[in-house]
């Protein structure tokens, strides 16, 4: 069993003494830093690698904190100018997750980079902390790598703002619901009985 497996098991048990101590110390450390700052390396390397991160040139990790809680409707003096049923201001729930917000803010901050994915790292009473994996589309190491150079294509600019990242698709409900529950029997049979020699193994 490799080292990443141990890290994964450690991360699962949030109430363990090690994790509680680490999260408390790290939350304090992250609060002292800027809202968006570059991390020298991922604080969860196993998770980052599963989501596509590689420790090589062209890949960057940014850490961000997002305030917890609902979203207040941005109306002046609480005047919504509508029927009473639509006059709510305070107890409204934002339909996208905090991780979506984190990706969007980092994407705007680093507008020359492309957002690949993100993951949760910590939270306290006020904030949630996320790390966002970004890729430099103009770096030669990225442009020459056939596994990641799809992101160089201009259609992938600001994919986080259009709900095309993993969490963005989840917020849009893609891959969920009655259409996805029962996969066709023929497709399953074909998948299990087809020899597929992939380029990367």
From Swiss-Prot:
PANTHER family: LARGE RIBOSOMAL SUBUNIT PROTEIN EL15 (PTHR11847:SF4), RIBOSOMAL PROTEIN L15 (PTHR11847)
Main location: cytoplasm
GO molecular function terms noted in the UniProt entry: RNA binding; structural constituent of ribosome
Description of how the protein assembles with itself and partners: Component of the large ribosomal subunit (LSU). Mature yeast ribosomes consist of a small (40S) and a large (60S) subunit. The 40S small subunit contains 1 molecule of ribosomal RNA (18S rRNA) and at least 33 different proteins. The large 60S subunit contains 3 rRNA molecules (25S, 5.8S and 5S rRNA) and at least 46 different proteins.
Extra facts: There are 2 genes for eL15 in S.pombe.
Function summary: Component of the ribosome, a large ribonucleoprotein complex responsible for the synthesis of proteins in the cell. The small ribosomal subunit (SSU) binds messenger RNAs (mRNAs) and translates the encoded message by selecting cognate aminoacyl-transfer RNA (tRNA) molecules. The large subunit (LSU) contains the ribosomal catalytic site termed the peptidyl transferase center (PTC), which catalyzes the formation of peptide bonds, thereby polymerizing the amino acids delivered by tRNAs into a polypeptide chain.
Domain of life: Eukaryota
Keywords: Cytoplasm, Nucleus, Phosphoprotein, Ribonucleoprotein, Ribosomal protein
A GO CC term assigned to this protein in UniProt: nucleolus
Subcellular location: Cytoplasm; Nucleus; Nucleus, Nucleolus
Species lineage: Eukaryota, Fungi, Dikarya, Ascomycota, Taphrinomycotina
Phosphoserine: modified positions: 183
Any Pfam family: Ribosomal_L15e
Organism: Schizosaccharomyces pombe (strain 972 / ATCC 24843) (Fission yeast)
Family: Belongs to the eukaryotic ribosomal protein eL15 family.
Annotated Gene3D superfamilies: Ribosomal protein l15e (3.40.1120.10)
Biased composition (Basic residues): 169-179
Biological processes per GO annotation: cytoplasmic translation
InterPro entries: Rbsml_eL15_core_dom_sf, Ribosomal_eL15, Ribosomal_eL15_CS, Ribosomal_uL23/eL15/eS24_sf
Protein name from the UniProt record: Large ribosomal subunit protein eL15B
Region named Disordered: 161-182
């Amino acid at each position: 069993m490799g080292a990443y497996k141990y890290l994964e098991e450690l991360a699962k048990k949030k109430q363990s003494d090690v994790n509680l101590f680490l999260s408390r110390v790290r939350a304090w450390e992250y609060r002292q830093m800027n809202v968006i700052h570059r991390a020298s390396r991922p604080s969860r390397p196993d998770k980052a690698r599963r989501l596509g991160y590689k420790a090589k040139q062209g890949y960057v990790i940014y850490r961000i904190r997002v305030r917890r809680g609902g979203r207040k409707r941005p109306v002046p003096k609480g005047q919504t100018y509508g029927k009473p049923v639509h006059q709510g201001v305070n107890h409204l729930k934002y339909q996208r997750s905090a991780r979506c917000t984190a990706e969007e803010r980092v994407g705007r901050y680093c507008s020359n980079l492309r957002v690949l994915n993100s993951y949760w790292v910590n939270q306290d009473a006020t904030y949630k902390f996320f790390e966002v994996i970004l890729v430099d589309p103009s770096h030669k190491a990225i442009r020459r790598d056939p596994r990641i150079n799809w992101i160089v294509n201009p259609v992938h600019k600001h994919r986080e703002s259009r709900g095309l990242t993993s969490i963005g698709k989840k917020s849009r409900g893609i891959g969920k619901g009655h259409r996805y529950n029962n996969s066709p029997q023929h497709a399953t049979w074909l998948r299990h009985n087809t020899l597929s020699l992939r380029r990367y193994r």
